[in-house]
Structure formats: C-alpha cells, structure tokens
Amino acid sequence: DMNVRVADASDGYKYTAPVGKFPPNPFGIYDMSGNVAEWVADWMDTEQNYYFISPKDNPLGPTRKNIRDFDGGANEKILRGGSWGGGIETLRSAWRKAFFRNYRFENLGFRCAKDI
C-alpha cells in the first residue's frame, strides 16, 4: 500500500496541481483524474439503483424529488474521479462514491462547466 502523504510526488506537486498544468485528454478535457475528486449534481439513489436503469450515454442522475429517503440516500451526493489522496482504483473518471453533502476534505473539489 502506498502512503500518499509521504510518497514521492514525481509530477512535482505534493498535493493538487494547478489547473491545466498537464496536457488534456483526447477529448480536450483537463485534470479528469488524479488532482481532486469532484462533486457532481447526481443524488445517490440506493433504492432504485438509478445507474443500472439509466441511459448508457450521459445519464443525468436522478433528481432528489424522485428519490425516497431510503437509508440516508436522499441526503448524499456523488463524487467522481480519483484524487491525489485516493487509491489506484479511484484513478478513473467513471469512479463514483456517495458522500453526505457536508463532507469536506482537502482532495475534493468541483468543476465549473457550461455547454458550448
């Protein structure tokens, strides 16, 4: 197991790197994994298992009004992509995990985006 707090930061940054410091991926998007895990708009849906019944391409996630408060799920939002502080299994854009909305940590962030 790698201890990320004491590991050699071979990219030159011990924690987060400045936005856009490395080349974009093939889609032209910067920093999709390894910098910070990002909050997304999706609510956690533990009861209906939304992602198994959602469209394959661009699932927008359930809305809170469509989720019953089952086992705390209606109070949790989704984090996606891994961060500098996560394990190797989190270092892909498709990784996701539910956390309570008030959860804060130094390796979490969000991405501002707009349609163009």
State what each model feature region is.
Residues 23:
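Active-site neighborhood of thiol-dependent amide/isopeptide-bond enzymes
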